[in-house]
Amino acid sequence: MLKLTDITWLYHHLPMRFSLTVERGEQVAILGPSGAGKSTLLNLIAGFLTPASGALTIDGVDHTTTPPSRRPVSMLFQENNLFSHLTVAQNIGLGLNPGLKLNAVQQEKMHAIARQMGIDNLMARLPGELSGGQRQRVALARCLVREQPILLLDEPFSALDPALRQEMLTLVSTSCQQQKMTLLMVSHSVEDAARIATRSVVVADGRIAWQGMTNELLSGKASASALLGITG
């Protein structure tokens, strides 16, 4: 279980404050207007931002001040952050060993994830030789191979065309179910959220303004639907 209790981030001396509970294995979408604080929320969970106050626990363990490298969390951004001079295999391998000295078990784990992502025939290529969708598959593989219990997505597929984006969302959802991972995904699209998350959280003005069933948001009947431009 992921639990945030009054986690506060001071943005230009204006506090953003979040309280949220996500069950193990749950898939949750984080929605809201631009600048509302969605990415800030993910960065607080990942440890890239240190809160001014509040508490963050994962499976009952306090991780409020744990550095990102030691948190049981993986995060995937729109900018996939692949190293252009490293091959696909090496980029994925970084998720297992920063020194890229992989033992036989780690090698097999890396190739198993690559097969799952459908990129096992691209392992010797450089990122510059790949399409945008292929690069995001590599970045996702690097996250999954770490086998952390929580996966955070900050609009990683927003630059992809609709068909490819839907394909990636399905791949993420299936992979998280197989590995029993908790998923939190920032998105500007309620339709994308509905494909992957039964529950959604709406962030507005640095607060969680609403949380509930994604389908309720889509129907226009939720109190927060208007924040997303949805009318019933």
Curated annotation (Swiss-Prot):
ATP binds at residues 32-39. InterPro entries: AAA+_ATPase, ABC_SmlMolc_Importer, ABC_transporter-like_ATP-bd, ABC_transporter-like_CS, P-loop_NTPase, Thiamine_ABC_ThiQ. One of its GO terms (molecular function) is ATP hydrolysis activity. Its EC number is 7.6.2.15. PROSITE patterns: ABC_TRANSPORTER_1 (PS00211), ABC_TRANSPORTER_2 (PS50893), THIQ (PS51288). It is a peripheral membrane protein. One of its GO terms (cellular component) is plasma membrane. Residues 2-230 form the ABC transporter domain. Its main location: membrane. It is found in: Cell inner membrane. Transmembrane segments: none annotated. It catalyses: thiamine(out) + ATP + H2O = thiamine(in) + ADP + phosphate + H(+). CDD domains: ABC_ThiQ_thiamine_transporter. SUPFAM superfamilies: P-loop containing nucleoside triphosphate hydrolases. Keywords: ATP-binding, Cell inner membrane, Cell membrane, Membrane, Nucleotide-binding, Translocase, Transport. Part of the ABC transporter complex ThiBPQ involved in thiamine import. Responsible for energy coupling to the transport system. Belongs to the ABC transporter superfamily. Thiamine importer (TC 3.A.1.19.1) family. This is Thiamine import ATP-binding protein ThiQ.
